[in-house]
A protein has these predicted regions:
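C-terminal boundary of histidine-terminating zinc-finger modules
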Residues: 231-242
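Cytosolic-facing regulatory segments adjacent to core modules
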Residues: 79-91, 96-134
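C-terminal alpha-helix
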Residues: 247-259
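N-terminal phosphate/diphosphate-binding loop that engages ATP/GTP or pyrophosphate donors
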Residues: 28-93
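Conserved beta-strand scaffold positions in the cores of enzyme catalytic domains, especially
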Residues: 4, 36, 95-97, 215-218
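Active-site signature of alpha/beta-hydrolase-fold catalytic machinery across serine-
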Residues: 21, 25, 48, 144
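Conserved catalytic-core segment of NTP-binding enzymes
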Residues: 111-218, 227
Length: 259
């Protein structure tokens, strides 16, 4: 399997935008192939990338559970589910996208989850990078077979509430039994005139130090991000000199050599 890069943080802090900006970087740098996984049921990574979502892993799982005997003749359940998963995989010129979708309903999902998890693991082996946009609880990664994360980005906006959510996520890692090799905090929506971490508020930095995780990137407030959102444009079309694009590039170029 390629390198696993995970992004986690409180909803509304710029987590999915950060994930989309990373996909933008990898596609422009042409250092893929990359598989982007939208593992947050409330996320819209596909939308930020300008991709239409036809199906999700959650849809496949729920539809199968409603009619587990509805497998076409000549196929077994494993082959049928793998066929549906291949259909749910969105293939773009520079990246592929898999949407995990809705969470489980009632009933026993052990068999179908085992098949879907195994397929996802095998699929990920075909890519140089696996970028996972997570829900705050990190449930998707905790259920993966290996649980290995080469780089975990903990995303917060420039607020104590966002940072405290990062602290809670950080505190869950041991319980989730995730094998995290490297991690760092990404602060979004910082003032455009902020040059580096030395300009961050003292109370904010005190809480960062209490968490014990290094800040690896500052993503400035970028009016283009709001413009693109209002115009429903893909963040892949952002100009290369956009402040957010430049900041993401500088961050990833420092991180890639160490993972």
């Amino acid at each position: 399997m390629g390198k696993v890069i995970a992004v986690a943080g409180k909803g509304g802090t710029g987590k999915t935008t950060t994930s989309a900006l990373m996909v933008n970087y990898f596609t422009n740098a042409e250092i893929g192939p990359i598989l982007a996984v939208d593992a947050d049921p409330n996320s819209n990574l596909g939308e930020t990338l300008g991709v239409d979502i036809v199906s999700s892993v959650g849809d496949i799982r729920e539809n199968f559970m409603k009619d587990p005997q509805g497998v076409p003749s000549g196929m077994d359940k494993i082959n049928y589910l793998e066929m549906l998963m291949n259909q749910a995989l969105i293939e773009d010129k520079h990246f592929d996208l898999l949407v995990m979708g809705r969470q489980e309903g009632t009933g026993c999902y052990c068999m179908v989850n085992n098949i879907l998890n195994k397929f996802t693991e095998q699929l990920a082996g075909s890519y140089k990078y696996l970028l996972v946009d997570n829900e705050a609880g990190m449930e998707h990664l905790s259920r993966r077979t290996s649980g290995r994360i080469d780089m975990l980005f903990l995303v917060t906006d420039y607020s104590l509430r966002g940072l405290r959510a990062v602290s809670r996520i950080h505190g869950m890692l041991d319980d989730l039994k995730l094998d995290v090799k490297n991690m760092g905090i990404v602060v979004t929506r910082t003032p455009e005139n902020m040059k580096d971490q030395s300009d961050l508020n003292a109370a904010f930095m005190k809480e960062v130090n209490d968490i014990g995780v290094e800040i690896v990137g500052l993503i400035p407030a970028d009016s283009l991000l709001m413009d693109f959102d209002m115009e429903q444009r893909s963040l892949l079309d952002l100009p290369k000199d956009a402040p957010s694009v430049v900041a993401i590039g500088q961050m990833i170029e420092k991180i890639i050599p160490v993972i």
